[in-house]
Amino acid sequence: MSFRRFVEIGRVARAVYGPDQGKLVAIVDVIDQNRALVDGPCTHVARKSMNFKELELTNLKAKFPHSAKTGVVKKAWEKDEISKKWEESHLAKKIAAKEKRKTLTDFERFKLMKAKQARNRLIKIEFGKLRKALKKTPAKPTRKPNKKLHKV
């Protein structure tokens, strides 16, 4: 399996540490093997240098030239609809669900537990019905045994 997310000009990343945690930024320039110049004009992140360890690369990419100014980055961001694509992405939905789970009250966690128990009970019942039906009519072998290997 090959990598699909490379550090490149225009690659959109999510800040995972620091004051801009959770905000999206675009890589404007690569400073060295450890740092990049990033800018997030639509997410209110000022242009600054960030360590790659602070960034999580996404599948999104905006097209703009090397070392582009903030205005150019903003136009490319809006043209490629990066914010809209991010909201529709699997990772963004997963992060939103995790945040929602953090804000649940004790009673809401209890209701969730009961709903999961009811769902699992239904699955168990249906699986039992399938198992019972399979025992009544055993499955036929798909191929005949090899006579050379199984001598009687």
Swiss-Prot record:
GO molecular function: RNA binding; structural constituent of ribosome
InterPro entries, per database record: Rib_uL2_dom2, Ribosomal_eL14, Ribosomal_eL14_dom, Translation_prot_SH3-like_sf
Bilayer-spanning residue ranges: none
CDD domains found in the cross-reference section: eL14
Pfam families reported in the protein's UniProt record: Ribosomal_L14e
One GO cellular component term noted in the UniProt record for this chain: cytosolic large ribosomal subunit
Assigned keywords, A-Z: Ribonucleoprotein, Ribosomal protein
A biological-process GO annotation: translation
Family per record: Belongs to the eukaryotic ribosomal protein eL14 family.
PANTHER family named among the record's database cross-references: 60S RIBOSOMAL PROTEIN L14, LARGE RIBOSOMAL SUBUNIT PROTEIN EL14
Protein name per the record: Large ribosomal subunit protein eL14
UniProt source species: Lumbricus rubellus
